[in-house]
Regions:
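Small-residue-rich helix-loop
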Residues: 51-54, 325, 332-500
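Soluble periplasmic/extracytoplasmic beta-strand elements of cell-envelope proteins
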Residues: 39-43, 51-53, 70, 87-89, ...
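Short active-site loop at a secondary-structure junction
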Residues: 53-73
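Conserved serine DD-peptidase/penicillin-binding transpeptidase domain
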Residues: 15-29, 77-366, 449, 483-486
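Bacterial N-terminal signal peptides
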Residues: 1-9
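Primarily a LysM-type cell-wall glycan-binding module
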Residues: 499-535, 547-549, 557-559
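Residue-level preference for non-acidic, small/hydrophobic
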Residues: 48, 67-74, 144, 176, ...
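Beta-lactamase-like hydrolase cores
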Residues: 14-59, 131-136
Length: 559
């Protein structure tokens, strides 16, 4: 199938550009695409040339490329230093160490309460309990309430494939999350004739389990199966497992994240000797919440007080999880947070409106845009290649580009975008991938051999082969990185991305952290103390600095 390509105006069609265009079209036409539809656009951010255009205005399903819209809107609407807060609240008095009433765990969406950023899965819970103990609380004479009413729901988008709802990438969206709303089933053989032993990691999953499986001495017929038709239904463990079998692991989403959080927090409390006399209850609707639809839970309730509070890492850290790891839960929660910040309602509809308004304010072309979720998992989403390229162009001209660029996966880099690792694109091209059934996409930016910044978006819907689509993306990315203009026609090239200007002061130097460095080494190099560095970097965690991070360094001799 020959793809139609929008040709450049005659004055721009230098021989080098014509050759590039020919090479790109030949790459597309290497394979037969049947009824598949491509949308592609390559645009020079430095010269303003459109180097390739294949149906760039066609609105296609973008898969995870949609995360580019979500994260851009989050940076503009929330800011890179935005934090999620989790509160422990009560309006009850404390007598002899016992809280005389209900205790509420109130979430505002933090998806990072897990071992992703901390030493253990329940470390955030333990820190909250530290604060309760410091307040002298040794017991709770009331209920434990897990309040997730900050977001109104639904837990899952109706456009997500039903067969995927057990998988980690469709974890339920909630204002309260723990362990990214998944548990791992660990199944070990029992005595012959008895059911296998079942546990979940972490425990207290709040999942109903129907274990009818059997441990056998010989071959398993039928083999062990761990099944669930819908997240709200019991997990069924059926079949047989040999007595000499290794343990079997299966990860599944929890049915209701707030139930999971409530059960897990209660277990953490009781593990520290803080007993709860009442039930564990879940609140998901604002109308049922004693906290109410407030952005700051301490406001609006006479006598209500914050007993403990956890503050998340900055949004900029979370955006790297979204774009580099394509984490859907983080994307969905951030999407809802954008809606909540914009209109006071964290529904999918309000959030989509907020994203669109942000894009329009940036001057991004949004014709054909249809957004149903924040992650791109829904097959009902629609975006054009022109919108993605226009977004990259607008972001690259703005003050938040360093944070946005830092969140994108680098080609040839393990655990980011491992493809194109032996090409000119390696450690140069940065782009978001996207894959759902029949859909493949890659959108981002790469520098040519001349250093020219080329924004691109490649999307295909109805692809008969994901492997072929990814191969085409790789070849095009590598070819763009290898592109060189005829001498004398190279446009003025923008400088390499600098760290955010807002984090610099005239009286301080700056240091970019190298691989393996720690604060002690950096302090010695500049002749300052660690505390002096931390004073001018109030958001830096002294126990976690990473390669590529920028630090302000106070100059010796004062201001």
């Amino acid at each position: 199938m020959l793809l139609g390509v929008a040709l450049l105006a005659a004055p721009l069609r230098a021989q080098d550009v014509e050759q590039l265009q020919t090479d790109l079209v030949e790459t597309f036409n290497t394979y037969s695409w049947g009824d598949a539809r491509w949308g592609a656009l390559v645009y020079s951010l430095d010269s303003g040339d459109t180097l390739l255009a294949i149906a760039p205005d066609s609105a296609l399903a973008p898969a995870s490329n949609l995360k580019l819209l979500t994260t851009a809107a989050a940076l503009h609407r929330l800011g890179p230093d935005y934090r999620f807060h989790t509160y422990v609240l009560s309006d009850a008095p404390v007598r002899n160490g016992v809280l005389q009433g209900d205790l509420t765990l109130y979430g505002t969406g933090d998806p990072g309460i897990s071992d992703r950023f901390y030493g253990r899965k329940d470390e955030v819970f333990q820190r909250l309990i530290d604060d309760l103990e410091a307040a002298g609380i040794t017991g709770i004479d009331g209920d434990l309430i897990a309040d997730a009413s900050f977001f109104p729901g639904p837990l899952r988008d109706a456009g997500w494939e039903r067969r995927d709802l057990n998988e980690h990438f469709t974890a339920g969206i909630s204002a309260l999350s723990y362990n990214e709303n998944v548990v791992s089933f660990r199944i070990r053989p029992g005595q012959v004739g008895a059911p296998p032993r079942v546990e979940t990691v972490p425990p207290h999953s709040a999942l109903e389990v129907d274990n009818t499986a059997e441990t056998v001495s010989g071959r398993a017929r039928p083999r062990l199966a761990i099944l669930r038709d819908d997240p709200v239904e019991p997990v069924r463990i059926t079949g047989q497992i040999p007595s000499n079998s290794r343990e079997v692991w299966r990860q599944m989403t929890v049915a209701v994240p707030a139930d999971f959080v409530g059960a897990s927090f209660r277990a953490a409390l009781e593990g520290r000797g803080i007993t709860v006399s009442g039930a564990t209850r879940t609140v998901e609707l604002p109308i049922e919440s004693s906290v109410g639809r407030l952005s700051a839970p301490a406001l609006g309730r006479p006598g209500a007080r914050i007993l403990a509070r956890h503050t998340s890492r900055p949004l900029s850290d979370y955006l790297e999880v979204v774009n580099k790891e394509s984490n859907n839960l983080f994307a969905e929660v951030i999407f809802r947070a954008v809606g909540r910040a914009d209109s006071g309602v964290g529904s999918p509809e309000a959030s989509a409106d907020a994203v669109r308004r942000t894009l329009v304010a940036l001057g991004v072309e949004t014709t054909g845009l249809r957004q149903h979720d924040g992650s791109g998992l829904s097959s009902e989403n629609r975006v054009s290649a022109a919108t993605f390229v226009d977004l990259i162009r607008r972001m690259s001209d703005g003050p938040l580009w360093p944070e946005y660029w830092a969140s994108l996966p680098r080609a040839g880099t393990r655990r980011e975008l491992g493809r194109m690792y032996r090409t000119a694109a390696a450690d140069n091209l940065r782009a978001k991938t996207g894959t759902i059934d029949g859909v493949s996409a890659l959108s981002g930016m790469v520098r040519s051999r001349d250093g020219e910044r080329l924004a691109f978006s490649l999307m295909v819907n109805g692809s008969p082969s994901q492997t072929r689509a990814k191969r085409v993306e790789n070849q095009i990315g590598a070819r763009l990185a290898d592109f060189r203009r005829t001498p004398g026609t190279v446009p003025v090239i923008a400088e390499e991305t600098a760290p955010p200007a807002s984090r610099t002061t005239a009286s301080n130097d700056r240091h970019r952290v190298n691989r393996g460095e720690n604060l002690s080494e950096i302090a010695r190099r500049y002749g300052v103390t660690i505390n002096e560095i931390l004073q001018v970097n109030p958001r830096v965690d002294r126990n976690r600095i990473v390669a590529g991070q920028w630090l302000e360094i106070p100059r010796q001799g004062g201001n």
